[in-house]
Amino acid sequence: MNVFHDIKETVLAQVAALQAEGRLPEGLETGRVAVEPPREAAHGDMATNAAMVLAKPAGLAPRAVAEMLVEKLVGVDGIVAAETAGPGFINLRLDPKIWRKTLKTVLTLGTAFGASTMGRGAAVNVEFVSANPTGPMHVGHGRGAVFGDALAALLVKAGWAVTREYYVNDAGAQVDSLARALYARYRVAVGDLDEAAFAAMLAAREIEYGGDYLVPVAADIAQADGTRWTTVAESDWLPAFRAIGIERMLALIKEDLAALGVVHDVFTSEQALVRAGRVDEMMTDLESRDLVYVGTLEPPKGKTPDDWEPRPQTLFRATGFGDEVDRPLKKSDGSWTYFASDIAYHHDKFKRGFLGMINVLGADHGGYVKRLKAAVKAVSNGEAELDVKLVQLVKLLDNGEPVKMSKRAGTFITLREVVDEVGKDVVRFIMLTRKNDAALDFDYARVTEKTRDNPVFYVQYAHARACSVARHAAQTFPGRDLSAAALAATADLDLLDADEEMAMVRLLAGWPRLVESAAEAHEPHRVAFYLGEVAAAFHGLWNRGNDNAELRFLLPTDEARSLARLALVQAVASVIASGLEIFGVEPVKEMR
C-alpha cells in the first residue's frame, strides 16, 4: 500500500472530473503531477503541485486551478481538508484512519512492505566492480561493490528483474603486467632470483605488482612445475602465467566480494568475447549501418587522449549519438581498442535482452561516459538506455589520521583488511551514507563508536530497542498473542493519538514512496537517510517515556494502549529491517 500513490490517483480522478464538467480542457499532460510530504509538517499531511503543472496548458492561473481542485478533493477518499498555498500548491490533510490502515499493512506484510511493481518486471543489467583481475580489491572497489549491490537490491524491491554482472577485463596489457610480476615471484620461489633483485625490478618499474598476494600463487607453481619455466622463452611462459594469474586473482576477488556479502550472477570475460567473434559481429552490424569509417581525427585541444593518433584510423561515428568526437576502434598494430571490446560487450548485453543497463564505474572514468552512452544508443538502435553511476574515492582514516599502507597489497589498504577489522555490515552501511559521486571518509574510530553520530549504530540501536520492547511485552502480557498478524487484527490503533505517534506512523507510511523514488533515481543512499529519520523519530518516542512513565510503550495497567503502541514499535522494526535488507545488512536484535 502506497498512500501517496493512492492520493495521487484521487487527485488525477478529480482532474478528470473537472474535465468532464468542461471546467478544465481535455488532453492535459498529467505526468508531472506529484503528491509528496509537505516541506513543513504544520502545512498538512501531503502537498500536490497539480494546479501548478496544469495551469499553463489549461490557460488558467495556478490558484484558479487549485481552488477548483480544493473544492473537489475535500471529503473524497479520506481527504478531510485541502487548502491552496502560495502560488498554487495544494496542502492536504487526511483522516487519521488512512494512516492507521497503512500501519496495519506494515504489520501484515512485514519486510515486504515497500515492495513495488513500478519496474513491471523489466530486465535491467547492473554491471559493477569489474576490477582488473590483477590483485585483491581495494576500498574504492568496495564502495563500488556495495553501491552496485544495494542498487540492484533496490531495483528488485521496486519491481525490476535484475542481473548483477562483472565484466572481467582479461584481454589488456594489465594482465600481461600481472603475468610478468607473477613470473618474477616464481623465479624467487625457485631460487632463480633473489629478493634484492626482485625489489630492484620493482623499483625500476620492470614489474608493476609487488604485493605479497602473488607469493602463494608463485609457490604453488614452483611446487607443481619446479624450474621448468626458467629456461623457456617469454612467448612460452607468458600465456601460461597470464592464465594462472587471471584465474587465481579472480578467485581472490570473488573471496573478497563474498566477505562483503556481494555475489554476482554473471561474470563475462572480455577475452572470451573477442575469441567468440563478438567484436567482429559488432563491427559487421555497425558497418552495415554506415556507423564505421576510415578517417583522421583532428588533434584535440588541451590534453591529448590516449587513443588519438595522427593517422587514418577505423572510427566509430560516436558524434552521431551525443559524443564529442568519433572514436578509434583499431590500434596502429591492427588490434582492437579497449573501446571496441566495450562496444561489443554492450552489444552482447543488448542481444541478451537488456534494454536497461547500469554501469557502476570509478570516478576516474568520467571521461568515458559519453562514448559508452553513444555506443549503447548505436548498437541498440536507440532501444536500450544506459545510466553510468560514478563512484567517488574513499579516504581511510583512524581518529582523523590517514591509514598507512598495507603490506598485503604493497600499495593500498585492501577491502578484506577493512572488512576483517569492522565487519561487513558496518562497511556496507557506511559506504551508502553518502551519494555515490561524493567523496567519503571512512574513519575506523567513528564507524565503531556507540553514539548517535555513528549512523550504522544509530539505526541498528533503534531496531534493537524495538526488539527489546517486543521481548518485554511478552513478559508483561503472558499468554497474549503478540505477533504482528495478531496486532494487525486486534490492536486498537485509534489509541495512537499523540502527535509524535502519528508523525511516526506517517513517516513509516512514506517507505513505499521512498523505495520508488530512490529506485527511479538510482540512489540507494536515500534509504540510509530515511532510516536515519526513522531511527531518530523512534529514539524520540523512547526517550519521552524516560521523562513521563505514562508515555512508555508498555503500560501494565493499560493493555489496550500498550498493544497499540507495540503495533507501532513492531512496524518500526519491520521498516528498518526492510531498509537494511536492501543494504544487505543484518538487523541487530540485541546490542552487545
From Swiss-Prot:
Cellular component terms per the entry's GO annotation: cytoplasm
Statement: the UniProt record of this protein carries the keyword Ligase: yes
Keywords: Aminoacyl-tRNA synthetase, ATP-binding, Cytoplasm, Ligase, Nucleotide-binding, Protein biosynthesis
SUPFAM superfamilies: Anticodon-binding domain of a subclass of class I aminoacyl-tRNA synthetases, Arginyl-tRNA synthetase (ArgRS), N-terminal 'additional' domain, Nucleotidylyl transferase
PROSITE patterns referenced in this protein's UniProt entry, alphabetically: AA_TRNA_LIGASE_I
E.C. no: 6.1.1.19
CDD domains found in the cross-reference section: ArgRS_core
Major location (coarse): cytoplasm
Residues spanning the membrane: none
Pfam families: Arg_tRNA_synt_N, DALR_1, tRNA-synt_1d
InterPro entries, alphabetized: aa-tRNA-synth_I_CS, Arg-tRNA-ligase, Arg-tRNA-synth_N, Arg-tRNA-synth_N_sf, ArgRS_core, DALR_anticod-bd, Rossmann-like_a/b/a_fold, tRNAsynth_Ia_anticodon-bd
GO process annotations (BP): arginyl-tRNA aminoacylation
One example GO MF annotation: arginine-tRNA ligase activity
Enzymatic reactions: tRNA(Arg) + L-arginine + ATP = L-arginyl-tRNA(Arg) + AMP + diphosphate
Keyword set includes Protein biosynthesis: yes
Compartment(s) of residence: Cytoplasm
HAMAP family in alphabetical order: Arg_tRNA_synth
Similarity-based family: Belongs to the class-I aminoacyl-tRNA synthetase family.
Assembly with partners or alone: Monomer.
Protein's name according to its UniProt entry: Arginine--tRNA ligase
Name of the encoding gene: argS
